[in-house]
Amino acid sequence: MSKTIKRIGSRRNEHRVLKGVIYVQASFNNTIVTATDVRGQVISWSSAGACGFKGTRRGTPFAAQTAAENVIRTLMDRGIGRVEVMISGPGRGRDTALRTIRRSGILLSFVRDVTPMPHNGCRPPKKRRV
């Protein structure tokens, strides 16, 4: 007789999450959107590159919007209704990603800009000559 083997990674005992944190990391070349629970466990992530955008199109606002929509879709499926948003970086997709999260219907607890600012740290790269 064969014994039944307990499945590893069974989704039956998955804990219910009601509140999450969305991190938007917007660089000049790409936008990465990560959704975690309040403990920091990653629920879902997406980036402009993972959505199929290549090269310079990854830094566009539309690519950031697509990445944010993918993460929000996963959060809605999990039943998460309230999120905190942490935005980091100087990229063009940061405002578009925030606008997409606002329009989605998920309640925002707060929005925080966590872009690291140097207190006159490293020397910046030289000016670009085109």
UniProtKB/Swiss-Prot annotation:
Entry keyword set: Chloroplast, Plastid, Ribonucleoprotein, Ribosomal protein, RNA-binding, rRNA-binding
A GO cellular component annotated for this chain's UniProt record is: ribonucleoprotein complex
The primary site where this protein sits is plastid
> Which GO biological process categories is it annotated with?
translation
Gene3D superfamilies from the entry? Answer: Ribosomal protein S11 (3.30.420.80)
Q: Which GO terms describe its molecular function?
A: rRNA binding; structural constituent of ribosome
- A Pfam entry, by short name: Ribosomal_S11
**Could you tell me the superkingdom of the organism this chain comes from?**
Eukaryota
Question: In which compartments does the protein localize?
Answer: Plastid, Chloroplast
Protein family membership: Belongs to the universal ribosomal protein uS11 family.
Subunit structure, as described in the record: Part of the 30S ribosomal subunit.
NCBIfam families hit by this protein = PRK05309.1, uS11_bact
Name of the molecule in the record: Small ribosomal subunit protein uS11c
Q: Which organism is it from?
A: Pinus koraiensis (Korean pine)
The root-end lineage is: Eukaryota, Viridiplantae, Streptophyta, Embryophyta, Tracheophyta
